[in-house]
Amino acid sequence: MAKLKMKSTVIEQKMIADGICSMWLDAKEIAVQAKPGQFISVYSNDKSRVLPRPISICEIDREKGTLRIVYRVVGKGTEEFSKAEAGDSFEILGPLGNGFPIEEAKGKKVLMIGGGIGV
């Protein structure tokens, strides 16, 4: 599975709780490869913030080629993301991480621990 860096367009963005945002991104090449448990790195458009923000993929729609990320606004980078509107774009890198081996876990008890906001 190849990591891809691409420009991704915001399809929809909304605040779903105090300081928690949900964003759908158009990312066909990443969406077709992504597995549960993986994440993307989202790059700020403000060039003063060099490091991307790692954000878990919350939902994948392979047919539409879209990804949903849910994140907490905690600093300048995620604050910038929270102000994005449909049609805005960000560079993203992904899919990253090993994901969850869903097929291997069928019929077994599994313990999962989430970090961040638990998505």
Please report, for each region that a protein language model flagged, where it lies by residue:
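FNR/FR-type flavoprotein reductase catalytic core
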Residues: 76-119
